[in-house]
Design a protein with these regions (language model features):
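Acidic (Asp/Glu-rich) sequence patches and key acidic residues
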Residues: 1-121
Length: 121
């Protein structure tokens, strides 16, 4: 699971970036299942229809990031389980890392870039 920013022109839609777009990595997570569950819920709210939320870029807005920040600070990420996730509940260190990601992503957006979440397994 990872996030990256692309130039505004390369963010084609909520779920698509231009092929070959230059991606600037923001954050990489390994087995942060509750965060992925939150992102999958957001994907569905934005109209995502694929049964499996995997290898699908998800555009994140300032509002999305503010809502995620609130969920992290109130320990309100959805409990998410599954074969690929294992059992690694969020802790103080992962919370710090998540909040740093949000600040960086907000900065990227403020600089005119688009930020996407993606996963692959």
């Amino acid at each position: 699971m990872y996030t990256y920013s692309v130039a505004k022109k390369d963010g084609l839609s909520k779920f698509k970036i231009r092929k070959g777009a230059d991606r600037k990595e923001i954050q990489y997570w390994r087995k942060h299942h509750d965060l992925h569950g939150w992102m999958e819920k957001l994907y569905r709210q934005k109209g995502g229809k694929e049964q499996s939320f995997n290898c699908i870029p998800l555009l994140l807005t300032m509002e999305d990031l503010a809502n995620l920040q609130k969920a992290i600070l109130t320990n309100d990420l959805p409990k998410t389980t599954g074969f690929f996730f294992g059992n690694n509940p969020p802790d103080e260190e992962s919370q710090k890392q998540d909040l740093h990601f949000i600040a960086t992503a907000m900065y990227e957006i403020s600089q005119g870039r688009k930020v996407y979440y993606d996963s692959w397994w």
